[in-house]
């Protein structure tokens, strides 16, 4: 790829952002070396791995990638028979542990079919737990070996400690002696050349027998090893030599363990570097709200709401740009600071990013072509040393482009033909565009020249575009309008700024009639476009309001039908309760009458029995009336000749279903109503038309469709909080109606706003019994498990 264009389009700044998201030095180096490529297959593979990393990060959050180090040189040392120092061993251990943790992390929750590339990398990692544990036991810090590294080392260090105590006790006796103290500079014990000594005054060197190891800078103090501790110091020295030998043996033993698997560990490091790099691309995609573009080799480009990734995401105006299908050359006109150059850079940079395997900040459905070269002549890059003018600098770039361009290249010109006489500059611009058009090169150029606007209007394969300018506010809107040539607006701006109208009219008289007619035509086109845009926006608003109203109506309808179903269920329960209560009352009355049998005379007893009978009859009549209102029976005669498959209505439930078996001797049949199978007497049934009545039965229709359509999970990732709330509320109602007891809400990790809002909503929902965060295997922090009543 052209290095000048890489610099001009600020591709390096995107690489810097990618490098910042890499954790290891090797992955950072890999990021710095990333360049656009031309192979369709390789680019597709790189895009797929970025998409997999983005998906995993959304579902599971950050992955355990800390602790990846460059251990190649340490592995080489072990292979040639050298041992590693404690610091080097700790770096090896960290890298091995990261590989093992990654394998464990993905083994617990990743679906290999969803992320085949990342899963393939993870499967290539090997664990070396025994070597990890050995290093963990032996190495305490960058400079210290643990006492537990071996029993021999522990024993030697115990002896060293004991010998140290013996030497210090002996020396304490000497420095605390009243005879010796007057010869000492200070009553302290110190070390010189790894041996214990005491500070003796120069003039009393003969009063303290021993070996002199050092003296102070002034010469006033001699550091003497008293003869009484020489033998102890010698023994201590021998023990420290033994300690050093044992430590070397331990380090060599660990190095030999590592050397056996040096090749596998080297492969681990390569894979870990690749994983670190892939997830850095995934993090970058998430942060800039990137998408995987649809790639092609036909030169077709369609950027949907593309955003320049280096500009503030909250302020940048999205660009919609297409080229390659009906035209290969696009001429953009418009005011300065209107966004023309940003549009060029957005197209060039997004194309480079896509060909590097990076996602692009745009909407789904964005299409980008794979170019063999991307050329950009943008900005004034003249060299002071070369003493080139603006025009000469641009023309030097254009000469290089014309020499190297192919039919599969993308060429971007900023202010084509500028910096010289306008007439000659416009002529050169048209000649250059014509040459590239004849080569079928994809070309986008910005200009102020009216001649180039007319060139685009009169030549096939060339299209005009403009950046919108609001004359009322004297400011650009930064919107790109393809198919609409830009108007200069010089006269309108001058009038708005206060230039007398007479001067403006006089200026217009200096223009040719063709130019005036052309500008008037552009003004009419712009006026019609604005009116059409207003009408389109109004139509869109009305359509959205209608869709919103329809959704609300359907939602309210379903809620009312669900409430009706619940009322029917409650009424049925109440009817059964009243029947049971009446039965208990009758039994109580009869029992009382029996007790009165021997106490009352026959006449009185008969009268009481008659009263009781009337009381019972009245209660049963009341119950019958109440039950009749609830069930609302429509037929008096039960249906005859019912057979399996017949469509019937259950009068007590107002549910439509199908007969499952023949009528039994008791006059009962089994009926399938939605998800329920119930035994019903034929007196509680009426025959219905199989198609008409089933469709007319709101409850039956809803129950049937809900049962078939309602799933055990709902995915609201990518929606804002309000949209997610509406969808989840409706989903919980549907799930409750069809009898689901547990459902899953997939919301992703993200910023946590969506998850928090859903949590508050679930606390208030009448159908929810409990809810909790998902565990590994269910989706972790990215899902919420809901138990329904």
Curated annotation (Swiss-Prot):
Entry annotated with the keyword NADP: no
Keyword check for Hydrolase: yes
GO biological processes: mismatch repair; negative regulation of DNA recombination; rescue of stalled ribosome
Residue span, Smr domain: 714-789
SUPFAM superfamilies: DNA repair protein MutS, domain III (SSF48334), P-loop containing nucleoside triphosphate hydrolases (SSF52540), SMR domain-like (SSF160443)
Keyword annotations: ATP-binding, DNA-binding, Endonuclease, Hydrolase, Nuclease, Nucleotide-binding, RNA-binding, rRNA-binding
Domain of life: Bacteria
EC number annotated for this UniProt entry: 3.1.-.-, 3.6.4.-
Region: Disordered, residue numbers: 690-714
One MF annotation (Gene Ontology) recorded for this entry: ATP hydrolysis activity
Binding site for ATP: 334-341
InterPro entries per record: DNA_mismatch_repair_MutS_C, DNA_mismatch_repair_MutS_core, DNA_mismatch_repair_MutS_sf, MSSS, MutS, MutS2, P-loop_NTPase, Smr_dom
Enzyme class: hydrolase
Gene3D superfamilies: 3.30.1370.110, P-loop containing nucleotide triphosphate hydrolases
Ranges annotated as spanning the membrane: none
Similarity field: Belongs to the DNA mismatch repair MutS family. MutS2 subfamily.
Assembly with partners or alone: Homodimer. Binds to stalled ribosomes, contacting rRNA.
Function: Endonuclease that is involved in the suppression of homologous recombination and thus may have a key role in the control of bacterial genetic diversity.
UniProt cross-references to HAMAP family, sorted A to Z: MutS2
Protein name per UniProt: Endonuclease MutS2
Protein species of origin: Alkaliphilus metalliredigens (strain QYMF)
